[in-house]
A protein has these predicted regions:
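Multi-pass membrane catalytic core of lipid/isoprenoid biosynthesis enzymes
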Residues: 1-38, 133-169
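Alpha-helical transmembrane segments of multi-pass membrane proteins
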Residues: 54, 58-59, 109-120
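Alpha-helical transmembrane segments
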Residues: 103-113, 168-171
Length: 171
């Protein structure tokens, strides 16, 4: 059950929790960004923008007039934000470089994160259909949602093997 619908939290409690988490995220993000880039203000501004954009994307997932999570776009955003952006961003913060193999690693994480979202959406397919929430499983049905899930997992496994054979990790 959803936390508000189940009565575990009121709307005000949920909003306060979101605000506290946003404040903590901004504080920690700024500290890490400032530490990583010292006085390179271009990268500081870029990463602050990406941080704010990520927070807004998280809020727009389920809130607002047209939350994209209710229209089948959650998978794309999860792949981008939890996969590519989080891996690229973390890597760049630590190395100040961009390497194409990070795209493979970000895609692996992205496919697995979308897999978790897909499992939740499959579980909720009946209720989401009643609530007119247009997730991928509600659009394609239970049977094809399972095939979609197989694709997500197999794609991540194939990319793991691709990365492991192409880029041997040495001591």
């Amino acid at each position: 059950k959803r936390v508000i619908a189940s009565g575990k939290l009121t709307l005000e409690e949920l909003k306060k929790g979101i605000i506290v988490n946003i404040f903590i995220s901004i504080t920690l993000s700024y500290s890490l960004i400032k530490y990583s880039f010292k006085n390179d203000y271009l990268f500081i501004v870029i990463f602050l923008f990406l941080s704010i954009f990520s927070i807004l994307a998280a809020i727009k997932y389920t809130m607002g007039k047209s939350p994209y999570g209710y229209y089948g776009f959650g998978d794309i955003f999860v792949f981008i934000f939890f996969g590519l952006l989080s891996v690229f961003g973390s890597y760049f913060l630590q190395t100040n470089s961009i390497d194409y193999e990070v795209f493979i690693l970000g895609s692996i994480i992205g496919f697995l994160c979308v897999g978790v979202l897909n499992l939740n959406n499959i579980r909720d397919i009946e209720n989401d259909s009643k609530m007119n929430k247009k997730t991928i499983p509600t659009r394609i049905g239970f049977r094809y949602a399972k095939f979609y899930h197989y694709f997500l997992i197999i794609a991540s496994i194939l990319l793991i093997f691709t990365f492991a054979t192409k880029f041997k990790i040495s001591n």
